Amino acid sequence: MKYSLIKYRFQNGSEAAWHRDIAEFIAALDGDPALKGKISYRCMKSRNGCDYYHLAAAADDQAIKTLQERPFFGQYRERTRLAGGGSVEVLPLEIVAETKAPA
């Protein structure tokens, strides 16, 4: 698995509309036969603030390549950039240790 953390501070637009955009992106991931089961995606935000954290996991490099070829990915990436006021950080992650059964 390949993991990435996407983080930014929400700065533009309606938070409710942004949450709908995120849900639509996740639905597109789940609905794409070539990506289903190969990409995991979660979005979280700080409870008392405007900081957002997206955790993405891909089964392999091919899943990432396939995702990057999808028009919905480019559109979502641009919307994320706009939501973050042009400042979005993407951090590749590696697991150091984990429980046997992920929650």
How should these model regions be labeled?
Residues 1-70, 82-103:
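Short S/T/G/P-rich N-terminal loop/turn motif that feeds into the first structured element of a domain
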Residues 72-73, 77:
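Long, charge-enriched, surface-exposed interaction segments in small proteins/subunits
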